[in-house]
């Protein structure tokens, strides 16, 4: 669920999804288009692609099992959908942590109209 994804992001980056990631670049937040702006935005692009593989699942609201221990996120057992959504969220949160050194405040609340270039495909 979105709330669980927010907790994973906070665990990995020490930043809240809102405001730091909800409207970042061209892909973080709802939807996405054109070319990712940087490594952080690319994490969101890959997360969107991961969700596209599970379109029959309720990616925004399905509650899944996971734990945050010893610096790691571990997804638990559940339905196929819940396990896949958890993995998408876990991988994205870890990606955002790895991208912290290149995070740019200037890409927060980035207007869609400034997203340029051809859209990438998953």
UniProtKB/Swiss-Prot annotation:
Predominant location category: secreted
Active site: 47, 89
Binding site for Ca(2+): 27, 29, 31, 48
Protein family per UniProt: Belongs to the phospholipase A2 family. Group II subfamily. D49 sub-subfamily.
Assigned keywords, A-Z: Calcium, Disulfide bond, Hydrolase, Lipid degradation, Lipid metabolism, Metal-binding, Neurotoxin, Secreted, Toxin
Cofactor-binding details, from the entry: Binds 1 Ca(2+) ion.
Stated name of the protein: Basic phospholipase A2 F16
Reaction equations catalysed: a 1,2-diacyl-sn-glycero-3-phosphocholine + H2O = a 1-acyl-sn-glycero-3-phosphocholine + a fatty acid + H(+)
UniProt note on tissues of expression: Expressed by the venom gland.
One Pfam short name: Phospholip_A2_1
Family matches, as InterPro entries: PLipase_A2, PLipase_A2_Asp_AS, PLipase_A2_dom, PLipase_A2_dom_sf, PLipase_A2_His_AS
Transmembrane segments: none
Cellular-component GO terms for this entry: extracellular region
Cysteine-cysteine disulfides: 26-115, 28-44, 43-95, 49-122, 50-88, 57-81, 75-86
Regulation: Pre-incubation with heparin markedly reduces the neurotoxicity of this toxin.
EC code: 3.1.1.4
């Amino acid at each position: 669920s979105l709330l669980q994804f927010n907790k994973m992001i906070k665990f990995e980056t020490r930043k809240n999804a809102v405001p730091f990631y909800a409207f970042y670049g061209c892909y973080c937040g709802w939807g996405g288009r054109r070319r990712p702006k940087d490594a952080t935005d690319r994490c969101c692009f890959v997360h969107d692609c991961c969700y596209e593989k599970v379109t029959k699942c309720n990616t925004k609201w399905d509650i899944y099992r996971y734990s945050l221990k010893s610096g790691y996120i571990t997804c638990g057992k559940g339905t196929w959908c819940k396990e896949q959504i958890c993995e998408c969220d876990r991988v994205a949160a870890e990606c955002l942590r790895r991208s912290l050194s290149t995070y740019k405040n200037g890409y927060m609340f980035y207007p869609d109209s400034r997203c340029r270039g051809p859209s990438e495909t998953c």
